């Protein structure tokens, strides 16, 4: 009598794996095509001029602000960022320096973080993560974050918590 091949025990496992795969794949004939993963609202690229339109001055507009080049919809915090609110000066622009220094001085309401101390940079990262990213949806990025000064793509750009962001959608 011939001995079975040493891999004979793999056949039942392969059959089981095939059966499980067939059960998990919906039948196209039954009209059950797999649905693509749900995508959040698309993010977009904002110029400084476009971002300025969302400063909280218009009642029917959302309120956006940017920190570290990431644009957040802070409309749910209208009492903080809306017209006449205590932090309205931060809205409608990238105010990274002001956030880092905890300053509302007009000279600090800029994206420029050059010259900040290590403590201020740490505060910026902390507020960025624990306040803005934790509380408010990301709606886009500033052009400055995605593009270099000469208009070429910033090869170091990495989206923040937006796996559905595709830079080619912006061009």
From Swiss-Prot:
BP GO annotations: MAPK cascade; negative regulation of appetite; positive regulation of MAPK cascade
InterPro entries: Cyt_B5-like_heme/steroid-bd (IPR001199), Cyt_B5-like_heme/steroid_sf (IPR036400), MAPR/NEUFC/NENF-like (IPR050577)
Listed GO CC annotations: endomembrane system; endoplasmic reticulum; extracellular space; membrane; mitochondrion
Entry's Gene Ontology molecular function annotations: growth factor activity; metal ion binding
Pfam families for the chain: Cyt-b5
Localisation per UniProt entry: Secreted, Extracellular space; Mitochondrion; Endoplasmic reticulum
Key words, A-Z: Acetylation, Endoplasmic reticulum, Heme, Iron, Metal-binding, Mitochondrion, Secreted, Signal
Cytochrome b5 heme-binding domain: residues covered: 43-128
Stored SMART domains: Cyt-b5
Domain commentary: The cytochrome b5 heme-binding domain was proven to bind heme, although it lacks the conserved iron-binding His residue at position 81.
Protein task: Acts as a neurotrophic factor in postnatal mature neurons enhancing neuronal survival. Promotes cell proliferation and neurogenesis in undifferentiated neural progenitor cells at the embryonic stage and inhibits differentiation of astrocytes. Its neurotrophic activity is exerted via MAPK1/ERK2, MAPK3/ERK1 and AKT1/AKT pathways. Neurotrophic activity is enhanced by binding to heme. Also acts as an anorexigenic neurotrophic factor that contributes to energy balance.
Miscellaneous information on this protein: Non-classical progesterone receptors involved in extranuclear signaling are classified in 2 groups: the class II progestin and adipoQ receptor (PAQR) family (also called mPRs) (PAQR5, PAQR6, PAQR7, PAQR8 and PAQR9) and the b5-like heme/steroid-binding protein family (also called MAPRs) (PGRMC1, PGRMC2, NENF and CYB5D2).
Family indicated by similarity: Belongs to the cytochrome b5 family. MAPR subfamily.
Subunit structure of this chain's protein: Interacts with PINK1 and PARK7.
Protein name per UniProt: Neudesin
């Amino acid at each position: 009598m011939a001995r079975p091949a040493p891999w004979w025990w793999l056949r039942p496992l392969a059959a089981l794996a095939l059966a499980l795969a067939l059960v998990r794949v919906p039948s196209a004939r039954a009209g059950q095509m797999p649905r693509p993963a749900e995508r959040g609202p698309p993010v977009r690229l904002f110029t400084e001029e476009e971002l300025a339109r969302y400063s909280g001055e218009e009642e029917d507009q959302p309120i956006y602000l940017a920190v570290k080049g990431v644009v957040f919809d802070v409309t749910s915090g209208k009492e903080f960022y809306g017209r006449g609110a205590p932090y309205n000066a931060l809205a409608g622009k990238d105010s990274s320096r002001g956030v880092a220094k905890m300053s509302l001085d007009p000279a600090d309401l800029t994206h420029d973080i050059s010259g900040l101390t290590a403590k201020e940079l740490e505060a910026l990262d902390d507020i960025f993560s624990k306040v803005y990213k934790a509380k408010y949806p990301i709606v886009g990025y500033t052009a400055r974050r995605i593009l270099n000064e000469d208009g070429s793509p910033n090869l170091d750009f990495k989206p923040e918590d937006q796996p559905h962001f595709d830079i080619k959608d912006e061009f």
